């Protein structure tokens, strides 16, 4: 590998100011030199993989007392050749990869951990684009546009801080992207329903999320957090907000707070989220559009959980599982549109582990037939509402005190439930 000195003009981001900084001594190789730049404050290094010189191999920073390797970058891209995070010597439990100065991270290949499996975090306030990206030898994966927060007292990762607004002075720090693209996570994947999942256990933490096409597929949970400036992952901890003297005196523009799942002109059966465990969406002050299919094959009563706070959810597609839990509070609104369907795939009631039972039929029943959910819980506050203009089918419907006042069914031909139960 050739080593050369490079002078890169970067931008340091704070909520109120930005300044230029000179960075020296990047390790250089013509195959990936424009893909991975290690920040000067990071002890990680990068080299070409011995068996594939087109592939970058990152020798990660030493771990702290809690097993966290914290790596900082000025640029972090992954081509279809993939990238390796070498964890053989460090044996970290969590590998944080934070882009502190740089453009949106473009992930088009596999991100593999060599050595001990670990939780891999990719954090970039400028956004992340996953185009058929995947992970291997990971315990779980976190894609976030927030800044990881480490507790200085005990070295633990306690959560992420996200920006809900941006000052006009600061917009140049985001590579000239329009404001509706800042802090955005975009997925664009193949229509792939195979048993080979791209993720093991996926966490998506961003206030601006879009699935353009295809599926986000995870072996375990898919957990989405949106709409908050602070996301706590360590119970009992808190993130202290940093105050900036100029902040209150500078006009700030609010960043979008939205989740768009699928192309509204696409086939809902060929895009969406697929999990063998749970799909959980935690959203506050967010507008959500589902044009795809949210599918869980877990047998839990809460296989798909929508925890909505001051949030609007417009379901144009499918929500399919044995059990669903909708928690609506503080003026939240769930609208199951005319094209929306909430139920259970017929194959899930056959005891089969997946829907690849036959090409077209399960016995004499078409494979894509939708039957009633086993359990659907609608925990709706007095100031929140659910309106159904599509199809909702469940055997047991659980509500507060068997109350249906906040549930409006506009489909007289659809009997939502067989049995009405009280939430225990």
Residue ranges and their predicted role:
Residues 57, 75, 81-83, 104, ...:
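Detector for repetitive beta-architecture
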Residues 1-22, 33:
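Classical Sec-dependent N-terminal signal peptides that target proteins to the secretory pathway
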Residues 347, 396-398:
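Extracellular beta-rich repeat passengers
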Residues 20-277, 283-284:
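Solvent-exposed adhesion/ligand-recognition segments of exported proteins
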Residues 247, 347, 351, 357-365, ...:
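Intrinsically disordered, low-complexity Ser/Thr- and acidic-rich flexible linkers and loops
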